Swiss-Prot record:
Keywords: Amino-acid biosynthesis, Cytoplasm, NADP, Oxidoreductase, Proline biosynthesis. Belongs to the gamma-glutamyl phosphate reductase family. InterPro entries: Ald_DH/histidinol_DH, Ald_DH_C, Ald_DH_N, Aldehyde_DH_dom, G-glutamylP_reductase_CS, Glu-5-SA_DH, GPR_dom. NCBIfam families: PRK00197.1, proA. GO terms for biological process: L-proline biosynthetic process. HAMAP family: ProA. This is Gamma-glutamyl phosphate reductase. It catalyses: L-glutamate 5-semialdehyde + phosphate + NADP(+) = L-glutamyl 5-phosphate + NADPH + H(+). Pfam families: Aldedh. It is found in: Cytoplasm. Pathway: Amino-acid biosynthesis; L-proline biosynthesis; L-glutamate 5-semialdehyde from L-glutamate: step 2/2. Its EC number is 1.2.1.41. The gene is proA. One of its GO terms (molecular function) is glutamate-5-semialdehyde dehydrogenase activity.
Length: 415
């Protein structure tokens, strides 16, 4: 007997039922002690490791299907797991357990002249939806950060990673059950039908925020169609600007690291800007180094290439007139992610840092450092490229809201 896929109304009901269960779990999570959450995170790390073979077998099946479908190598790298990566995923959970708990943190407080005592403190957001592409590590990163910040999470991953994500979520839910916690604190939504994304991002009143992680097409679609608040993350047309004062040895190392370390991630450099004052020397040296490393340099880039997030061994080259030319170019073509300047001129560095519109600005450092772990936040939920309510690598504080608590002593407000 064949089994029919659920109809669209059935899928909508399925997603909304999951969201309702998540709301119940979120209410319980909000009042958990830090000790309980940390113990659950460490248990989750243990369960991930105990299920390494199952997880890797599932990932192998995903990779085989992706290769058969002609998936580009850069995307296969994002999808792939191995024993070291699984161990890294488990370590990430333990790192989150070691981070300060943001819930209950008092941000500010004061006593009013009438004697009322005010304090503003952090509280969980509630139910967080994550829509993401073929990166299984996001499954566990999202779980770890949402659990520690007292939120429930609804995960809608890519169909290309469906088996890997299911194996990981099964391990995480088993860990929650071991600790006597509500397993609906983490749920994996169906990935076979794209309508599940629509039902998630339009579940107003059930989902508190949706965070899309992936390429420009995914992010634009979620932001455009969502009826719940969204936090835009990740599209990275990151530039490295080599100023006329730059040490070219340093510039070469930074450019190569920013482009070639992991070209498929959002903090990889996609554009190289060279000051016209040193173009005669810097262009052949830096493009030669990139070419030798296997990078295709687009020396006469089209408008589309100047705006591209290649996510591959490609980089656009542009010559600009000094620091102001670089600032103007970046503010036209950048995506607000990470921008870097290589310079020995303090004034140029300060001008660039102040006037470039980006979540992170690197001075004499690779764009690859824009990362929650590198910033000391532990795992990250994403890198926000918007300005409200979070910007840059999103750690635990960015997964909270605030509540005002006011203490009185029979206070009433005069007419």
């Amino acid at each position: 007997m064949s089994v029919q896929a659920p109809s669209v109304p059935d899928l909508r009901q399925q997603v909304h039922d999951a969201a309702r269960r998540a709301r119940g779990a979120a209410r319980a999570l909000a009042s958990l002690s830090t000790e309980t959450k940390n113990r659950a995170l460490c248990t989750a790390a243990d369960h991930v490791l105990m299920n390494t073979r199952t997880i890797l077998d599932a990932n192998t099946a995903d990779l085989d299907a992706a290769r058969a479908a002609g998936t580009p190598e850069a995307m296969l790298d994002r999808l792939a797991l191995n024993p070291a990566r699984v161990e890294g995923i488990a370590d990430g959970l333990r790192q989150v357990a070691g981070l300060p708990d943001p819930i209950g943190e008092v941000i500010r407080g004061r006593t009013l002249p009438n004697g009322l005592q005010l304090r503003q403190q952090r509280v969980p957001l509630g139910v967080v939806g994550i829509v993401y592409e073929g990166r299984p590590n996001v499954t566990v990163d999202a779980f770890g950060l949402t659990l520690k910040s007292g939120n429930a999470v609804l995960l809608r991953g890519s169909s290309s990673a469906a088996r890997s994500n299911a194996a990981l979520v099964n391990a995480l839910r088993a860990a929650l059950a071991t600790e006597g916690l509500d397993t609906d604190a983490v749920q994996l939504l169906p990935s076979e039908d794209r309508a599940s994304v629509t039902h998630l991002i339009q579940a107003r009143g059930l989902v508190d925020v949706v965070i899309p992680r992936g390429g420009a097409g995914l992010i634009d679609a979620v932001v455009r169609d969502a009826q719940v608040p969204t936090i835009e993350t990740g599209v990275g047309n990151c530039h490295v600007f080599v100023h006329e004062s730059a040490d070219l040895d340093m510039a070469e190392e930074i450019v190569l690291n920013a482009k070639t370390r992991r070209p498929s991630v959002c903090n990889a450099a996609e554009s190289l800007l060279i000051d016209a004052a040193i173009a005669d020397v810097a262009v052949p040296r830096l493009t030669g180094a990139l070419t030798a490393a296997g990078v295709t340099v687009h020396a006469d880039p089209s408008e589309d290439e100047l705006r591209a997030e290649f996510l591959s061994m490609d980089i656009a080259l542009a010559i600009v007139d000094g620091v102001d030319g670089a600032i103007s170019h970046i503010n036209e073509y950048g995506t607000g992610h990470t921008e870097a300047i290589v310079t020995t001129d303090l004034a140029a560095a300060q001008r660039f840092s102040e006037r470039v519109d980006a979540a992170a600005v690197m001075v004499n450092a690779s764009t690859a450092f824009t990362d929650g772990e590198q910033f000391g936040f532990g795992a990250e939920i994403g890198i926000s490229t918007q300005k409200l309510h979070a910007r840059g690598p999103m750690g635990l504080p960015e997964l909270t809201s605030t509540k005002w608590i006011v203490w009185g002593d029979g206070h009433t407000r005069p007419a």
